[in-house]
């Protein structure tokens, strides 16, 4: 549920992005290879996250705009050339102009289009969840592109990665917290009431990067499903 939450990376992933920066400075003279670059991104300051856009749609779906700049490395250039050869330069540019980080197809799917990855989140019980990761090879693309996908999946999303262990720890603490005798309410109030209707082709609602719009949107959809409120009007308030 923290996929499109921009409040957690700089705190939750501090240990991993600081380790990446330390290794880069001490061992690589400041060079930041791909494996470290994708870890380092979590250390961007709060202003960076606030400037992202969060889009939410009816029935709990949402996505976050990209946190990495459009790559211009030799592999990305070779991929564009192969795509342009198959689809034409205009269509290739249009395809690659769709730049998103995390996408949530509520309740259980999360495609990551930049790295050809698809995650399926399967609840097993109230405190057990199975996460399956699928990677895709793009027909006609340079074979090194698939290797980059594997690297991203292993470094960022693998259960044994130094990034995912941060998230798993947070999930475990949330589960523990919900069993305590504390308050019954879980706050989702960041930027509540400030989200706006999006007038672009996508429709839906849009909030700035610090908004908790995506999680409010998910809980609103969950409530609709539990109460069978199929005809309830789409609202930004959540529940």
Give the location of each predicted region:
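Rieske [2Fe-2S] iron-sulfur-binding subdomain
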Residues: 1-239
């Amino acid at each position: 549920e923290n996929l499109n939450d921009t409040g957690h990376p700089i705190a939750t992933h501090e240990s991993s992005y600081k380790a990446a920066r330390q290794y880069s400075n001490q061992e690589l003279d400041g060079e930041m290879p791909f494996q470290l670059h994708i870890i380092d991104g979590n250390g961007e300051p709060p202003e960076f996250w606030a400037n992202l856009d969060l889009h939410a749609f009816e029935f709990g779906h949402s996505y976050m705009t990209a946190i990495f700049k459009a790559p211009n490395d030799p592999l990305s250039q070779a991929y564009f050339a192969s795509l342009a050869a198959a689809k034409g330069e205009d269509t290739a540019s249009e395809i690659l102009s769709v730049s998103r980080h995390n996408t949530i197809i509520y309740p259980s799917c999360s495609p990551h289009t930049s790295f050809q990855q698809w995650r399926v989140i399967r609840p097993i019980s109230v405190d057990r969840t199975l996460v399956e990761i699928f990677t895709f090879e793009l027909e006609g693309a340079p074979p090194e592109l698939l290797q980059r996908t594997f690297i991203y999946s292993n470094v960022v999303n693998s259960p044994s990665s130094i990034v995912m262990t941060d998230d798993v720890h947070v999930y475990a603490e949330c589960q523990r917290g919900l069993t305590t005798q504390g308050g019954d309410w879980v706050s989702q109030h960041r930027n509540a009431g400030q989200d706006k209707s999006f007038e672009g082709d996508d429709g839906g609602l849009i909030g700035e990067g610090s908004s908790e719009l995506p999680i409010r949107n998910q809980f609103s959809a969950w409530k609709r499903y539990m109460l069978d409120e199929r005809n309830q009007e789409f609202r930004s308030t959540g529940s």
